[in-house]
Amino acid sequence: MAIDASGAAAPNSSGITVIIVGLGPTGLAAAIECHRRGHKVICFERNPKSYRLGDLINVTGNAARVLQGWGNGSVINDLQAFQCNLDTLEVYDETGDLKLSAPYNANQAKDNYMLRRSRLLDIFLQHLKNLDVDIHLGTEVTDYWETESSAGVTVGGKRIAADCVVVADGVHSKGRPQVSAEPFDLPSTDGTAFRAFFHASEIAQDPEASWILQDAGEGDCFKTFYGKGLVMMLGTAENHEYIFWSCGSKENVLAQSSAVAQVLDLIGDWPVSKRLAPLISKTPSDNCLDQTLFTRSPLNKWVSRKGRMIVLGDAAHPFLPHAGQGANQGIEDAAVLALCLQIAGKDDVPLALRVTEKLRYQRVAAIQKRGVEARDQSLSVDWENGGFTKKLTLYPAWLHDQDCIKQVYEEFDKAVAAVTKGHECTFGGIPVD
C-alpha cells in the first residue's frame, strides 16, 4: 500500500472495509480519515441531512492538526472563510456592566476556528461527498452483528458486511448497547443548556433587538453574561449574517412548553434582561433546543467482544459543553482509529480497535474532568468578591498542543503490549501532575 508524505494512501488500498454509523462530527471525521488511510468506507446516517441545531463550535489546535491533511488544505481554508470575524471577547455581569474585554483576532488565533456548528458539518459532509465515499442519508440501521472475520449492520432487512463497524451515533447511541455490554447510565449533572441560532433578518427591523448588529459593526461580536448559577452567551457569526445565543443553568430546568420562554424566565431578574429579552424573544421556535447536560466517566469497553465493532465520540465519552472539546475529541478518535487500522492491517483489525481504545481512554477521561471543573467555574461567578472563584488555564498545552497522529506512531507498540500482555501503561495527551 503506497503512502505519501502526509500519511495518505490510495483509495481502497488497505483492503479494509469500514462501516460508519452516524454522521455528526465524529462519524464524518472517521469517514474522511479512514478514506485518507486507504480504507473503503460505507456510511449510514438516519437523518436525511446533517444535524442542524446548535450554536457555535470551536475547532481547537489539537483537532485542527488532523484537518490540515484534508483536501490539500481546502477544508482548513473553508473553516477560515466562515469563522467568526471577531476582534474582542466581552464579559459582563448580570447588570450589563462590562467586566472584561479581551482582544481576539480570528485571522491570527493559531489553529483555532470558531464557527456555526451546522457550517462545520456542511464543510465536512461536502468534503466527504467529494471523495466519492458510499453515503446513505436518511437510512436507519436496525441491527449490528459480528463474526470472527467480519462485522456489519442490518439496513432494511439486508445484512451489509465489512471488516469493522464504527458506532458514532451520539450520547443517546442506539448502537452502543449492541457493541458494549456495559450499562451506560447518564445521570444528570443538575444542569441544562439552551442553544439557538437564526438568521439576522429576524431582528434586523426591530430597534430593540438589532442593537447586536450595530455592536458587531463590519464583523462579529461575542458577549458573555455571568450571574449566580447562570451564564448567557450571545453574538453574531459569518459577518453578522447569523445570531446565536446559549444559556447554561446549574439547575435542571428543561422547558415544559417553549425553550425561549424558559430562558426569558431564567434571566428575568437580571437588570440586563431588558436589553437581552427583545433579541431572545425573536428566536424562531424551531431554531432553539434545550438539553439536560450529562457527564460520566468514559465507557470502559469501547470494543465489542470479537473486536470488530467500536464506539467513538459522544457515544463512548460524552463531554459537558464547558469542556469545549466534544467535536474535537471525536475528530481525534477518528484519526487515531484510521491510523491504527492502517498500521495493523487487514489481518489485525481487532487489535487496531483495541489499541485505539487504549490510546484514547486516559485522555478523554482527563478532559471530561476538566469539563466539570470548567462548568463549576462558569456557574460560580461572584462579582461582589472578585468574579471567578475558580480559575482554569484557558489553553493548557497538554490539551491544545497534543498531536494525536504523532502519538499513535510513538505509542502504538506500547498500546499493543497493554492489549496483548495486560501491561499497565500511561499514555500521552494527559496533564502531568
UniProtKB/Swiss-Prot annotation:
The active site lies at 195
- MF annotations from Gene Ontology: FAD binding; monooxygenase activity
Biotechnology comment: Notoamides have been shown to exhibit antitumoral activities. Notoamides A-C show moderate cytotoxicity against HeLa and L1210 cells with IC(50) values in the range of 22-52 mg/ml, but the IC(50) value of notoamide D is greater than 100 mg/ml. Moreover, notoamide C induces G2/M-cell cycle arrest at a concentration of 6.3 mg/ml.
The record's section on InterPro entries has:
FAD-bd (IPR002938), FAD-dep_Monooxygenase_BioMet (IPR050493), FAD/NAD-bd_sf (IPR036188)
| Pfam families (UniProt xref) | FAD_binding_3
Q: Which branch of life, at top level?
A: Eukaryota
Q: EC annotation?
A: 1.-.-.-
Annotated residues for binding of FAD: 45, 117, 314, 327
What's a BP term from Gene Ontology annotated to this protein?
A: biosynthetic process
Tell me which cofactor or cofactors this protein depends on: FAD
Keywords (A to Z) from UniProt: Alkaloid metabolism, FAD, Flavoprotein, Monooxygenase, Oxidoreductase
Pathway named in the protein's UniProt entry: Alkaloid biosynthesis
Q: Which family does it belong to?
A: Belongs to the paxM FAD-dependent monooxygenase family.
Report the protein's function: FAD-dependent monooxygenase; part of the gene cluster that mediates the biosynthesis of notoamide, a fungal indole alkaloid that belongs to a family of natural products containing a characteristic bicyclo[2.2.2]diazaoctane core. The first step of notoamide biosynthesis involves coupling of L-proline and L-tryptophan by the bimodular NRPS notE', to produce cyclo-L-tryptophan-L-proline called brevianamide F.
Q: Which PANTHER family match?
A: MONOOXYGENASE (PTHR13789), MONOOXYGENASE, PUTATIVE (AFU_ORTHOLOGUE AFUA_6G12060)-RELATED (PTHR13789:SF236)
Q: What is this protein called?
A: FAD-dependent monooxygenase notI'
- What organism does the UniProt record list as the source? Aspergillus versicolor
Report the gene name: notI'
